[in-house]
Amino acid sequence: AYTMLGKTASDIRVVRPLEDGVISDYEVTEQMLKHFFAKVNPSRVFKPRVCVCVPSAITEVESRSVIDTVMSSGARNVYLIEEPVAAAIGAGMDITRPGGIVVLDIGGGTSDIAVLSLNGIVCKSSVKMAGNKMNAAIVRYVRSTYNVLIGDSTADRVKREIGTVWTEGQPEKTVEVKGRNLVTGLPQKITLSSYELEMPLRVEVERIISALQSVMEQTPPELVADIEKNGLLMTGGGAMLDGLDKLITNRVRIRAHLAENPVEAVAIGTGKSFEYLGKLYDGFVSYTNYSSR
């Protein structure tokens, strides 16, 4: 479906069931979940237990929407776990120890930051600035600079191939893209450079850095030494933006490093969270269980 974005006929609609980390289309989300449940449980004799990863800043209303949708799709129990916790578990971090761990998860719609210790979240923040906003920044830049309109999928490719927020000491990269000239309406080919994309992307990333600085200001002094030693764990597809680790290390003075499998860390951690169920329940308020009646 993603490859069809911007390429469909007028009678076909491509829908994002989830946007900014929350449900945007309940009916489509329910049908999607039913399809997934049928794949893992074709007989449908037993209802599954489902763990859903949600942004740290999710509201009670949004949580309830997630729960109701998953339950109506055929789940027996629904568990909600916050993204930074799932990311840490998926990256192999030991969240049960008393030392502080700081996690930055940059997904498609939201960026979540949390300091973890002893199975709990000490302090956290969530901003609606992530991979999708970076793509939008590239689209805006190309439109204002070259008077050419490119699609979201093209912007995403540009971001992955040459997007960067740190060009110091780095070789220039270029990529050729095609779009529609807004004056003539005709196709036009342009060449973009990694150097020219640094500032448009850095403007967006500043919001993440500000949120990270705010979280660090709230962190108890006892955990700061641990965090300085352990560094900052980065997960999510957006965390793979070139130079982001260098920029964060330079601005926040904490060594930032990418997880071994950043794209799948949250998904892996969400699955593994069932192994931590008893431990996470012990005073861990962000892990919630809802059962069908």
Report the location of each language-model feature.
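Nucleotide/phosphate-binding catalytic cleft detector across ATP-hydrolyzing
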Residues: 1-106, 114-232, 239-293
